Amino acid sequence: LFVSKKYPEHWSEEYMQRAHYSLGLFLAQYLCNGFNMADAGRLTYNSYYYQTNGKAFRFNRKKTSRRSADGSEVIVPIIPPLRYILDEIAAPPTRDSFVFPDILKGAETEELRRKYTMQENSNVKDRVIKICHEALNWDKSICPSGTWCRHSFATNLHNAGVDMDYISESMGHSTSDHAITQIYIEYYPLDIQMQNNSKLLNLEDSSERDVLLAKLASMSTEELLKLFK
């Protein structure tokens, strides 16, 4: 739906644009390691983004409760679907600028930033629920929220067989240190992070199948006969 933009015709053009933006933010929360709206509002095109040639974000999680670790670092690999979303709704990359500036609206006080974050959370939830019910015709009992994104990120990667250590570190759950350690980066280099996060949308399986089919197509008749003997 985000790609086709086939929203209900009775919606106004203005509401379609707002709903499209909110759906993009919702999907970005899921693909950005389940981060929350406070993280989305503070996400920037920092030096790490440019060091990786625009292939990953690196940020410190915003503390949202007494139980969460303030300052836990997270690295988000920018897989193709996330890149598509960014191209649609994010601000153009400029060093140290906000990726989603419309969330905080340039607020200079923490009180105002919290207010705008809560407002955006509410807008996204309301519009995504409306999309589910009116555009996708899902059951009325289905009411997605930002919490769904975080839980789904962990659950879907776990079901896909991804290491729990990777999932935990990706969500900023490190208990020993608030920083991404060099060991983690060496153990899960960016290409591995890309592979793992691609499993959020079953992209890796499709990619492997396409590679296999391409190899088979390039083989000669003799090679194929040897393969199936």
What is the predicted role of each segment?
Residues 1-37, 41:
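Basic, Lys/Arg- and aromatic-enriched nucleic-acid-binding interface segment
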Residues 207-229:
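Short, low-complexity, charged amphipathic interaction modules
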Residues 47-56, 162-185:
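Short, polar N-cap/turn motifs at the start of nucleic acid-interacting alpha helices
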Residues 11-16, 62-77, 110-120, 140-148, ...:
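Short, contiguous acidic/charged loop-to-helix segments that flank catalytic cores in large enzymes
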Residues 61-65, 171-209:
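Catalytic-site neighborhood detector that most strongly recognizes the C-terminal catalytic loop/helix
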Residues 1-4, 79-140:
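Active-site/catalytic core of tyrosine-dependent DNA strand-transfer enzymes
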Residues 42-88:
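Conserved tyrosine-mediated DNA breakage-rejoining catalytic core shared by Y-recombinases
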